[in-house]
Amino acid sequence: MQIKVKKLEKEAKLPVRAHATDSGADLFALQETVLPARQISKVRTGIALELPENTSGCVWGKSSVETKGIKVMAGLIDAPYRGEIIVCFYNLNDTPFTFEKGQKIAQLVVLPTLYPTFVEGEISQTERAQGGFGSTGSK
């Protein structure tokens, strides 16, 4: 599958998978961006995509970034969207964090998408039922 990428800025980098079998393609910071402490910030990539029909783009964190206390606020890119890919982050730290120009900031995963219609009705019972939020214990 090929995905068309438009550079909105000359210095933008196209997404790159580090290894042929990696699920995610790295997204890069268009410019140096300082994330203030304990705040949400947006980081530009300088690219737009043309995702194939029946797919979506999911923006996920990179462990090399998130282990530094910088949390990607996961995003969903609909196939018809043609605007710039901008990644939102939350800096969990008490100090600012700087992304350098060209630094890997997040991962883009392209997934098949279903378009269900939601209808009201009774739902079947399962063994799990309503268990959630750690209901099975930690060990």
Language model features with spans:
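DUTPase catalytic domain/fold
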Residues: 1-139
